[in-house]
Amino acid sequence: IAMTLVILAGTAIALFGVLGPAFDLPMRGSLVLFFLITALYVFTTAGLGLLAATVARNLAQVGMLTVVILMPMLLLSGAWTPIEAMPDWMRILAWISPLHYFLDAAYGILLKGTGMDLLWDSVLAMGLLGVLVFGAGMGRFGRQFG
């Protein structure tokens, strides 16, 4: 919980200290909703980290697994290349990237002022991914150390 609060504080500093003043970013949506969805994304990525840590045998392997997990997740998120411009097989892979759903929700909230009535599918998908990966990580952790 403490690390989640640190990440949320860093997000707030970046949002209000950098993006707002430097780029004159118009924040149109609910900041409470944005931070709740950010906390859900942190939960999902913590699950990925826990799962990677239980698969690896040492810290060096965790570092390598992090690159192997994060690079495709970033490339398939839609941040650099729109999902619509990707081939069909890459679009399917983008569905398993929690970053794709987080960016969809964050853009919707901050730039468009969208509410949960239009973002529920992205939030639900990210939540399901979070429960799956965190559950898998906890299961592996329990078998290894329990």
Predicted regions and their residues:
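Alpha-helical transmembrane segments and their short interhelical loops
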Residues: 1-67, 71, 116-123, 127, ...
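A cross-family signal for key residues in well-ordered alpha-helices
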Residues: 66, 94, 142
